[in-house]
């Protein structure tokens, strides 16, 4: 049976679909129908790798190896036959260090929708080799973990990968493609001696050229005194193995005053503790060291414990433990006017508000007899300010930190010559000191009666400003300077001064002609009513003006002459701190006003100047004002893309008026561009019914018009020369005529056209030509009239496209298919003629087309550098004959053939022959596959020439056999989906096979080796629904034949869980009780509910044995207003087969109620029952049932009587009577129960319904021995 079909290549880019091998059931048949599906694909790589080193393996989901194969050495193709449906894992197993994506693929083979059945490729893509290396500690065979190692291309800065070293210093990069790389190591604290190396990756894994070396590791510790950190303690480092040259970042000079005690130690260097008491050695190589602390004060050397400490540096930073402690003084200081400043003499220094000393001329002071402790120090000096300092004084602080001045006085004075008349004189002003530094702080003080003031300021840059009241500012009071900048450094500033300011304002007037009489005004903008005017007069074209004694403020200066144009008719000036000058008014012309419906350009011509243009103005829509430079009558002509009511207008400067211009049409432009000069006609249709269709053309191109103009100019010059020649006579005719040439016509060609449209008009433009195609065929445009329409129409015309081609060598009947690029269906199909040629056209030249060719038995490939030409190659074929070792045809063999982009997988039929036709010339790789057989040759590369037909013979040898059987239930029904396995025994224990039964319960275990004994049994995994098998296993011994009729009976798991229980409570509450069952994740909705009725026992319908969590809850309808009670609940998991639970319910009444004693009612019946029990028990049972009913009635009557009694009686009698009644009933019940010969299930059922029985039933049974 043929279950797959290959296909030849119609071109190098065409790939045949993977073969889908469908099949059929498992049974004793031995043939191709046993194959369910074939899974194949490629191992792909962009770089050259050895495919023969890679294996593809198929595992079951439980990890059993089902099949393995290698890849085609030429293209990495692989194929694996599957004989069972189910879940599998496909893995690629390359050499160690090679990376692929993905590494595994999970398969669910159902024979219908999985990737193998559908013929899809399963591809593994090579992503690179591995690069290995080490980071070592200097002089050591191992290295540290945690060093950051980066990989980058040689000569670049960009990182490709980063990793960190593992313990021992090893590191590795994966997925590295061939190339030259640089490896760099970094660490935030460790010093690296060799921080980089190189590696070259070619076609396998690579190692770094050399190891990276860590020079050393940082070692740190700390020292304290009385719990406080100590600064300045020296720590000396010694070693007998490490040299000074290997230690980095450490002071190697000797320590004055230190006497070594151990001569065997070699001194290396020392470090000093910092402010926080910490010390560190920057870089120490791995090895053993000794550290000795040394601390000498100003006059004494202190002891430090421990006095010596040995430690070892391995491959990491080290924190020295324990902490060092200093075990077992006048101090001096200085007062400075700034950091690194001069000393402040005569400053008073106070210690804890008690001890006072004065500083010397250099600012120094000395405090005697100081003990270790915390002190408060304060310094005082006129015009200098200091902050109080709290300091810890200890033996390590013989020199106190400098006391630095934090502030200085800034003082000054305000001088006002006279106050404005409109305000009352003030005696005091607020003065503000503002910082120019980052904090931008403000300080405000008030002057004294004499105008003096002072600030306290820290060093920095400041400005001082006087806050003049707004009323005084409006009145013109201004102080100069407005702000006083100053810098406070290391001494007070005492020379800040402010004085009053008055100014003058001056300027000039420039006229085009004689100025005549003009008026200039100065008006205050901040003080209403303050206005001053100057009348200017003169027969000159320039005049000056000046306003004196102007108070500071904002002013508006204006010049009055409405019919003239001024560069500035008014100016605003502000008098601040200086006089204002250079104010200028300049006349620019004579005013003209016009109203326009659109923005246009106006050309002005003045009478008396001929056609000379005296002005061109670009004006906007609306009312425009502009100036004419001369007086007189002007002719005004609009120039724009709009047409107006008049072609021109007149204006007289002696009679000013507003010119009004309204547009009625708008100029629309269009262009048609072609690659050839052809006849072009344009039809324009308007949306306005009254406008007829306009036909323009045939149009002339811009190039044609330019040529005609050149010809006209040449003709005019020729006629001029002839005219001049006639006048000059014979003498002129002796000269040869001048030959003039015109420009050649060259494309593209542009055809321009235009149309005057009304506002809101919609036009449709349609071009036409005999030989051109237009894109688009027509265009619409709407003219709004708001602005120039411009070029609204742009259409391109192109000549039709013709596609032509040739087949080499000449081949008739080749099918040529023309398609638009991206289209799903072909546009045109033609066949080549007897010359092997074809031609298609005309086509739209602006579209892209694809040209393909095909002919049975040929491969056609496009000729490089041409469009539409193809080369034809005759295809080749290969025929395979596959036989068994007895020379009989071998059906069912899967033969995989691949080469280049071609691959095919076919099954041999009954004749054992497979033929692959229509193959392109080239190399091919074939591999026969069938489980339980080996083949010779097992695989081979073959070379196929053009038109060649090869014949290859393959022989298959049987190497293993199969076991057939069925799995059924006890009643003979087949069991589908049971996982079976054959487990090898004794010397064959490493071998095993597995499979799954089909829908008929049949199974086939393939690949069983001759001479081996196997146990055929159910697999431990995947058979959760099966409880056991009979027999547990079947023993088979494999010879040289298949084994049949290995049958096994299985028993399914019972998937049921029983839930029962009982309630311990008084029977009077039973009618009010319900038992509810919930799933633990949903306690809002019970899944089952049962009512107790008159029984203490309950049972739920069977549950699924699903391992879920459940909750059983007892619920009651007893009113909470009368009873207090707790509703019990029990949680459990549905594991196993049965669960019995007990719930206790003990409600109590909120108000005690009296019960009528019931002992007198039941004593006689109980006594009679005991006497007659042994003789008439067959007659006593009905009587006992009747008695039980009567007792319940009596109980109810007693309850009713109790309810009707008064509350006071109930309170007095309830407790006493209830106790006596309970004891008496219990004794009578015990006696009767122990004398009844049939106490058992029936007795429990009868007595459990009594009001008191449930409380004493269990206790009574235990006491029967006493009776």
UniProtKB/Swiss-Prot annotation:
Subcellular location: Endoplasmic reticulum membrane
Function: Component of the multi-pass translocon (MPT) complex that mediates insertion of multi-pass membrane proteins into the lipid bilayer of membranes. The MPT complex takes over after the SEC61 complex: following membrane insertion of the first few transmembrane segments of proteins by the SEC61 complex, the MPT complex occludes the lateral gate of the SEC61 complex to promote insertion of subsequent transmembrane regions.
Lumenal topological segments: 32-1155
Tissue expression pattern: Highly expressed in pancreas and skeletal muscle and, at lower levels, in heart.
Signal sequence, renumbered to the chain: 1-31
Cystines in this chain: none
Single GO BP term: multi-pass transmembrane protein insertion into ER membrane
Alphabetical UniProt keywords: Endoplasmic reticulum, Glycoprotein, Membrane, Signal, Transmembrane, Transmembrane helix
Region named Disordered: 1198-1219
Oligomeric and partner information: Component of the back of Sec61 (BOS) complex, composed of NCLN/Nicalin, NOMO (NOMO1, NOMO2 or NOMO3) and TMEM147. The BOS complex is part of the multi-pass translocon (MPT) complex, composed of three subcomplexes, the GEL complex (composed of RAB5IF/OPTI and TMCO1), the BOS complex (composed of NCLN/Nicalin, NOMO and TMEM147) and the PAT complex (composed of WDR83OS/Asterix and CCDC47). The MPT complex associates with the SEC61 complex. Due to the strong similarity between NOMO1, NOMO2 and NOMO3, similar interaction pattern probably occur for the three gene copies.
GO cellular component, one term: multi-pass translocon complex
Carbohydrate-modified residues: 50, 218, 618
GO molecular function term, any single one: carbohydrate binding
Name listed for the protein in its UniProt record: BOS complex subunit NOMO2
Superkingdom of this protein's organism: Eukaryota
Gene: NOMO2
Sequence ranges on the Cytoplasmic membrane side: 1177-1267
Organism: Homo sapiens
Membrane topology: Single-pass type I membrane protein
Membrane-spanning residues: 1156-1176
